[in-house]
Amino acid sequence: MEPAAPSCNMIMIADQASVNAHGRHLDENRVYPSDKVPAHVANKILESGTETVRCDLTLEDMLGDYEYDDPTEEEKILMDRIADHVGNDNSDMAIKHAAGPEMNIDIVTAAASMSGITTASHSALPIRRPNTPDFRRHSEKKAKKHKNKQRQRLDDVVAKLHKPSESEADEDFIFQQPQEEEYQEEQEPQVISSSPQHFDERSPSRSSSDHGGHSGGNSRDGQFYLSSGSEDEDDEDDERVDSGYRGSSRSEDSSRYRPHGGSHSSRSSIKSSGSGSSRHHHKRKAVPERHHPFTPPSAKRYAAAAPSSRYECPVRVDSSDSDDAPTMVQRGTLKIKSFRPPSSGSNSNKHSSSSGGSTSSSHKKQQQQQAPSKKPVMSSGSDKIRDMVDRTAGGYVAPNAHKKCREDKSRKYPARALEYKNLPFRPQSPQYLLGKAIQFCKEETVHDKFIMLFYTRSQDVRKAVDETRARMGMRPNLSISCPFMTEHTKPINHSRETIDRTSAACTAGTQAVWDMEERRGQKCVPRTSDYRSMIIQAANPPDFLGAVKTCLHLSQVFPKQVCMRLCSITGGLNPLPIYEETVSSYVNAQFEADDISHHEDESGEYESDCE
């Protein structure tokens, strides 16, 4: 073997420095260890014999990022001997296994072990992984799967921690409706134990809202704005706030919260109009606030982040049962109730949290309870009339049913609403309407007059009507109806016999008209028109003129979509007795004689200011 370069850090050929270092004669034909090699390794190499070792690479080159050929048989034998010599403890067992021929280890590992470089732990060197798109995609998928698994374990632990016992679940979530006597017996000890200040803060507001009474000079105004149904409205608002957490608003008809219902079809509007029926309210037991396992995580985080148990939020209030009820957003202070599981129908009282159910099964039960009911809801509108016609007249017959399908006699074809892009009648001029309104105000006959407002259901007209209703709502002494639809029956031309019989009965008098026979000759159900109507009635002339001008401004903006008419009521009175006092006060102030003064002239005669 040729002598290696002197720069070799691991093994070098004998030279003068090596001779002086080892203190003996060295053979130039042999390979000896360098001074940088540990002593026990150098002695082992010297005692091993005449076997040669590769020394063409430095230690830095061996530990660098290079690929090496497989070691030779002589190198494997030498590495095995070194491993047997230093492999007494457990830390060198990995070196012995790595030096074996079955592991196909390269010379770098052998050189590191010979130079005394050993790791503190038993772990192997880091494995180089390929940097390919497929491998990165596989790694991301594996990491995401592991993260989801850890999150699922955490959710299970949280669900077990928050899951109440069976007795607590029955106590909290089975809502009973006790009688008033039971409720009073339960509330009496609470009132006695509570402080007077705490009792004065809550009890007067509840009693005053129930009975509509207020102390002081504003008692009459309070009676007007507070009715006996205020308690029901408050509870309905609280339930709507809770429905936002438990997601029960999906099962309700969304057209109820729109100011003009759903589609143009008569059936859709009829079904939506029947969804707002009033519910009877009973006082519930006071239950402690508790997070239910069915509560969604978003609701738990929101409740935990809330600074107090009271907060301000916009509350949606429906003031009527129809689908055209005026929708208002009112800011108020509501109390957060405890979260309740979603309920549907009559199964709400039977729902209780199961102690052994898993999270997946409880989620499925929650989705089943939130699903809307498939049972048809009978409204109090045209559906009842349709059923009555089916029972009495022998079945509903659409006007053009014979054109659609002659053979299928059992099918009932629905009649769509009479749709009009523009109003089907010609409106009157604003000058004529304003002149008539002034004439009514001169005659002091406003109490038996009212305004009829008709408009189509286009989007821009509907928004303008809502703004007009809001402006009129700020005026006093007005009675404004909710927008409503009109039903129309089938037009039929009367025969000559019917005309003569009616004329003879009217000539004979009231008894003849009362005894006159009526002949019904049609079986069709009334059809609704898609345009809406409103009635506005005022108590005094200033309020009547203000409402007339507001409606005239709207009709001038939409001359073909909005129409206003003035109507008279035979023997009309105020819609509510609360306006009687303001009408009397207006009349008395107009014809009051206290301000009329009399002046005496020089001749001794009296002269009035009215002359």
UniProtKB/Swiss-Prot annotation:
| Locus of motif Nuclear localization signal | 141-147, 279-285
The keyword Phosphoprotein belongs to this UniProt entry's keyword annotation:
yes
Going by the UniProt record, its keywords in alphabetical order are: Activator, Early protein, G1/S host cell cycle checkpoint dysregulation by virus, Host nucleus, Host-virus interaction, Modulation of host cell cycle by virus, Phosphoprotein, Transcription, Transcription regulation
Localization (cell): Host nucleus
Q: Which InterPro entries match?
A: Herpes_IE2_3
Asked if the Swiss-Prot or TrEMBL record annotates the protein with the keyword Transcription regulation, the reply is yes
Indicate, by first and last residue, each region the UniProt record lists as having compositional bias (Basic and acidic residues): 198-213
Biased region (Acidic residues) positions are: 230-240
Region of interest called Disordered, as start-end residue ranges on this chain = 119-155, 180-383
- Low complexity bias locations: 260-277, 341-376
What Gene Ontology terms describe where this protein resides (cellular component)? host cell nucleus
Function description: Strong transcriptional activator of the E1 promoter, shows an autoregulatory function by repression of the IE1/IE3 promoter. The IE1 protein has some additive effect on the trans-activating properties of the IE3 protein.
Q: What is this protein called?
A: Immediate-early protein 3
Species of the source: Murid herpesvirus 1 (strain Smith)
Q: What is the lineage of its organism?
A: Viruses, Duplodnaviria, Heunggongvirae, Peploviricota, Herviviricetes
